[in-house]
Amino acid sequence: MGLFKIILVCFIAGIGAGLGTGFAGLSAASVVGPLLSTFLDVSPYQAIGVGLISDVLASSISAYTYHKSGNLDIKNSLPLLLSVLVMTITGSVVASYVPAKAMGSTMQIMLIILGLRFILVPIKTTKAQMNAVSKKEMLIKSVLGGIVVGFICGFVGAGGGMMLLFVLTSLLGYQMHMAVGTSVFIMAFTALTGGISHIAFGGIPDFTVLMFCCLFTLLWAQIASKIANKVDTRTLNIVVGIVLILTGIVVLVFNNL
């Protein structure tokens, strides 16, 4: 494959993946995977691996940006993180035995529905309301939510970003900025675990493709996360909703080409 084509596809994938990560806490793999498979003939399993490795850097820099703005809850998210990590490995192993065609089918419809939800019924929870939730209740919900999210992360290869955002806002009652910041923090670890597992079972991907995807995704994630931390909750709800809907539509189209 030509270098120009690789750079162009990775740049476009990086824009979508980076904006999705920085604004909405989405996994880079949900965008990178279908684009690499469609235009660069990378196997779906390896394409997801590239997306997850790109996700590690993008999520890490985004999490740092949210942390600087006080929008990252590390302590209370640890039970969720640990349960997600355990199930990510399980999901990734199971996915290695699934036909490539099945791997191309993700959760685009759910992305669109969740996007509409944030626009039509925005999250209005404040940090004070979030902190008033019982620690025991949050622990139980975190572990249960983590089991589901982790398996999805490993199996679908989407980093569980969409499900993490849903669990944090709807199940655990997080404030919107805090939910996105905590989501990308957890995703940095889940994507690393999932990425290593995908490479271990699916082989090492093309280094040039991996390098450019990581570079462009990191760049756009940094830009998006800085903007996200400067807008109010209502605006962030709308932005997140739009990003989710567009991502769902774009990935749905490419998966059916």
Predicted feature locations:
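A small-residue-rich subset of transmembrane alpha-helices
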Residues: S54, T182-H198, T208-A221
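Transmembrane helix-bundle signature of multi-pass membrane transporters/permeases
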Residues: G18, I48-V56, L85, V180-A191, ...
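Hydrophobic, membrane-facing alpha-helical anchors
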Residues: M1-I6, C10, I53-Y64, I112, ...
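Membrane-interface alpha-helices at helix entry/exit sites of multi-pass transporters
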Residues: V42-V50, K75-N76, G173-V184
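Transmembrane helix boundary and interhelical junction motifs in multipass membrane proteins
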Residues: F23-V32, G157-V167
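Short, structured loop/turn "capping" segments at alpha-beta junctions
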Residues: T126, A158-M163, Y174-M178
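Juxtamembrane transmembrane-helix boundary motif
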Residues: M1-L19, G33-F39, P44, T65-F151, ...
